[in-house]
Amino acid sequence: MKKTITTLLLLLLSLRMTGQIDYLEPIKDYSKYKSELSGYYSNVLSLLSTGLSKKPYACYAVIPSFSPEYTVSAETKNGKYYLISNTLSQNSWQAEKSTIKVNTKSTEISKTLYQALGELLQMATLQIQDMDGSTTGLDGTTYYFSTTNGKGEVLTGKKWSPDRATLMGRLVQIYESVYALSTGKAIPESLIINDARILLKDLQERSKAFPDEYKQPKYAGIFPAGLW
């Protein structure tokens, strides 16, 4: 009997971790919880947001299980447009905040790229799908996307280790290229702009075809991991 129950639990966990729900998912307010986990999120988000706008236009943050966390944000200053990235010197889960260094890099970009990144996140965060459970696994990487809407509200959605072929997987790939560009990698802006525009069009077409799909809560398993 115990073996049967264990097998069923493992099967449910496997299905939850491999199933793909192709929308960004909501986040929880970590500040309302008192635990080691909430302390971790408070520390890591504080470090990652160093020097970045409180009202993000297009911000991407990555929290892996074991490697250093990092973020990149599209910013504007004095009429110019920049990508600013913060990369932590080590994974902050087991580290004291005072021992972690923030490596900041910046690169100037075109207004066209800046706008393409913002338009993409405006669309992606318009359709955050409520979840019954969590698709976040014990290992892997969680990706966060933030933007500010016309009302001045910061909208943030997350995705855990999406398949590369999905819409959210493509969103992650685009922003991975954005992060790489911010750190000095030779990635053509035109490539990122083109990919962003194609994905934006695909998201818009899905929205027209299935306008209310994201409003339907999806069951995502019985093993929620983490506040976020």
What are these regions (language model features)?
Residues 20-228:
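Function-determining sites in protein domains
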Residues 1-23:
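Bacterial Sec-dependent N-terminal signal peptides
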